[in-house]
């Protein structure tokens, strides 16, 4: 209401875990929505996708998404605390997402050792200013326990 020209867009991909349906939505004042409706296709998404989106955005769907996000945040906080105890962790960047970016004393060694164990991480070694950095996605409790078991066994 405060900004007549503001449009907020959101995707159902990440938080709602619906990347495959390729659907999002816009929130704006009524006049902007009316203008948008004049230029979009009459049927911009197929019926099955619309039905899934309606379910995801229902009270129950939103509540489930909030619960998943809270649990992900809890697992991220635990992982961060566990990583801080490792002697070869130099820095953990602030994160509000479903991952942690971690600077290790030897990022490539950590990345390669985890890859040999079948743990998929993402190296940021070649990104400017992120030498020795590895991104760790927040998985299930069991996956994170396995990751920590492997990391604790490393000799770096």
Residue ranges and their predicted role:
Residues 5-83:
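PLP-dependent aminotransferase class I/II
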Residues 20, 96-97, 128-132:
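Short acidic/glycine-enriched loop/turn segments that link adjacent beta-strands
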Residues 8, 87-91, 119-125:
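A short linear hydrophobic-aromatic micro-motif
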Residues 28, 102-105, 138-140:
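Short beta-strand-to-loop capping motifs
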């Amino acid at each position: 209401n405060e900004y007549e020209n503001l449009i907020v867009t959101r995707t159902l991909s990440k938080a709602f875990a619906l990347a495959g349906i390729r659907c999002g939505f816009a929130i704006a004042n009524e006049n902007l929505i009316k203008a948008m409706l004049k230029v979009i296709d009459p049927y911009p998404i197929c019926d099955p996708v619309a039905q899934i989106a309606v379910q995801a955005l229902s009270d129950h769907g939103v509540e489930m998404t909030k619960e998943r996000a809270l649990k992900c945040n809890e697992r991220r906080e635990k992982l961060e605390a566990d990583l801080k105890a490792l002697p070869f962790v130099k820095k953990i960047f602030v994160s509000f997402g479903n991952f942690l970016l971690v600077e290790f004393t030897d990022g490539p060694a950590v990345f390669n050792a985890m890859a040999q164990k079948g743990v998929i991480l993402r190296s940021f070694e070649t990104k400017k200013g992120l030498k020795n950095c590895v991104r760790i996605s927040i998985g299930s409790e069991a996956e994170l326990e396995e990751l920590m078991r492997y990391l604790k066994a490393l000799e770096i």
